[in-house]
Every structure is written in C-alpha cells, then in structure tokens.
C-alpha cells in the first residue's frame, strides 16, 4: 500500500488532478446563476438555492450604472464560464469599491475552481472572506481546495495548511448559526448546510492527514461522508479515509472505506480495489488497533 500511496500522493500527478477535479466538478454542478440574486422561488431548484447560503447580502446599489452592470453579470449562466469570468473581472476592475464585490467574487471563486485556476480561486476567495467573513460556502470551498492542491514542496506549504485549517474550522463553526432565508424551504436549507459542512470537514480532515495526524483526520472524513447530501459520493474522501484507517492499524475499517471507494465509478476504482485486498492481508497478519 505504501508504494501505491507514494505513486498517487507524493508523485501526486494523478491524484492531484483527481482531487481538484472532484471539488471543481462539485462547485460547478452545485452552482446556478449568481448566488446573491433572488429570482422567484419556483424558478430555482433545491441545489440552486443551496448555493445562496450566507449571512451577508449586498446593500442597495450606489447608482443605476453599477446596478445594471451587476445585473448583466448576474444574468450570464454559470455554464458560460469564460464569459462570466470576463464580465466579473471587468466589474471588479470598474467598480473596485462596489457593494456587490462580495457576490461577484463569490461567483468567481466557483468559476475559477471549475476552470482549475487555483491561484485565482484562492485570491478571489480571500477577497470574499475579507468582505463577507460569514460566507460559509466560500470558506468551505477554500478549506477543501487548498489542501487538495497542496504539495510539500510549495514555498508556502505550512502557511497554506494553516489557512485551510482556519477556513474549514470557521465554516464548521458558522454554518449552524446561519438563519434560514425566507426564500428557502427547510429541505433546501438543510441541503445547503450539509453541502457546506461536508466540504469543510473534508478539508479539515485532509489538513490533518497532510500533517500525519491520522487519528484526527479519521473523524473529520467520517463526518464529511456522513453528512454529504450529494447523490454521487466523492471517492477521494473514502480513499483518504481508508489510508488513514490503515495507517492507524484499523484494518477492518480500512477495508470498508476502500470498498466504498471502489464501488464509485471513476479512476480510483482499481486503486481502491487493490487497497481493500491489501488491507485484508494486513488485517490477517498484523494486530489491529482498537477504534
């Protein structure tokens, strides 16, 4: 298993792309149009409304031109990523003091992530957090993405993990305090909170994992996979959970996590199937530690 782990995480190319691909796809599929607009409730799906979770809302526009520019940006579908990025960048350049900066940057976070532009995603995300510290979705996205994009050779490696830990913990702490918006049903609100918490716990778990704190990582990944409402589970969470379980000699738990990963279609299936087999062998020849 150690050889597989070195190939997939330290050499890093395959899993790094997979890590970013999973969170990028989640951000793109979980985003409707701009999260701060308020179209009629019947025109929004549960997943669209789940992406409006924040304590912060923009104040009234300063002038009609700024208002029109924001509405033009807001009207561009999230699926037209290049056009929406261009419009968002033009908006923040033209209106650097706009009261709409937080929602524009919040959208840019998701767009940059979907485009795998991690540095721009982080820059935009940190601007959002400075403007709207209670934007729990942005906190969770930053908290999950930074440790997934991380490698030990980065010049600011320790600082990046510290930031990810702070973002994830803030999202976990703040999400339960968010009041339900009037436009959301109870089901939509629960979905939004659970999506956010799943990302935040995953991010915090990976921070601990990167630091070699496997016992601390395990409950975070367990909570992430427990609350994640997405019908397509993220195999990466089960994969890293399995390795953490194996590292702490919880071989039966490692087999269970590897098996869940192997059941999810995707590039990790062969690796997780092999991991389950190897964890079974280790469990048969080595003493398991109590959970």
Describe each model-derived feature in a short phrase:
Residues 24-104, 288-291:
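N-terminal leader/linker segments that initiate helical-solenoid repeat arrays
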Residues 76-78, 112-116, 143, 147-157, ...:
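Short coil/turn linking the two alpha-helices of tandem helical-hairpin repeats
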Residues 94-101, 130-136, 155, 176-195, ...:
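Short solvent-exposed coil/turn linkers within tandem alpha-helical repeat scaffolds
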Residues 110, 144, 148-151, 206, ...:
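Residue-level recognition of tetratricopeptide repeat
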